[in-house]
Design a protein with these regions (language model features):
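Positively charged, low-complexity intrinsically disordered regions
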Residues: 24-27, 75, 135-139
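Short, intrinsically disordered N-terminal pre-domain segments
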Residues: 1-26
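A short, compositionally biased N-terminal segment around positions ~18-40 that is enriched
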Residues: 21-38
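An N-terminal, globular interaction/scaffold subdomain
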Residues: 35-111, 119
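A glycine- and small-residue-enriched flexible loop/hinge signal that marks low-structured segments
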Residues: 32-35, 89, 100-205
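Interface-prone segments of viral and bacterial extracellular assemblies
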Residues: 1, 81-83, 116, 158
Length: 205
């Protein structure tokens, strides 16, 4: 009779293992934006969760992130900082939004409107999170030297979608973060198709 409790434990461990496998198939994207009207931290599980009042430019970034690949991202940890200069945003890793990201789980970060200076600062911050905070996270950065496996360096200069809209390197990091987050661990995203694009400027080798 003493062994009656063992099957329950076996089922519980098995269920936990299945849950971990399912989570690994769909990672979490962290996305940091600035907006003239909206501010706060939001957990998005689908496009229907996009906060009201965001600019069309910011909504487009969330849409890009949710495109994913085999799967969509499990969720997006969205940080929106209110700024009167949202058209030319500046980001500070000591701001409340970035402090919030230190306290929640996410896998891939994109800050699509960060300039070169802020991108370097954010890259340093992400490296620090992995070493001092023991977080398992990566930063999809635009044109940052790939000197650390926690930094994913995206360098394509110009992308044009089927409607004719063009994206610069940094603007498209949301799409890349979502694509990687939606890639199951048993396959590679190296040759993942981007069906929304009509043109990608070739990289000079």
């Amino acid at each position: 009779m003493a062994n009656l409790g063992l099957p329950y434990l076996s089922i519980e461990f098995r269920e936990q293992g299945i849950a971990r496998i399912e989570r690994s198939k769909r990672s979490v994207v962290a996305l940091v934006l600035q907006d003239p009207e909206v501010s706060g931290e939001f957990q998005l599980f689908s496009l229907s969760d996009i906060p009201k009042g965001l600019t069309d430019k910011n909504k487009a970034q969330i849409t890009l992130a949710f495109m994913g690949y085999v799967h969509t991202p499990r969720k997006i940890e969205l940080v929106v900082e209110q700024s009167d200069n949202a058209d030319k945003p500046k980001f500070d890793v000591t701001s409340p939004g970035f402090v919030y990201l230190e306290s929640v789980r996410w896998d891939y970060l994109a800050v699509p409107f960060a300039d070169a200076e802020d991108t370097l600062e954010i890259a340093t911050w992400v490296k620090s999170l992995n070493t001092t905070k023991r977080k398992m996270c990566k930063f999809v950065a635009a044109n940052v030297k790939g000197d650390n496996k926690k930094i994913i360096n995206f360098t394509n200069k110009t992308m044009r979608d089927l409607t004719g809209k063009e994206y610069g390197t940094a603007e498209y990091t949301s799409r890349i973060a979502g694509l990687i987050a939606g890639t199951p661990p048993q396959i590679s995203c190296t040759y993942a198709p981007l069906p929304e694009l009509a043109y990608v400027e070739p990289i000079s080798m």
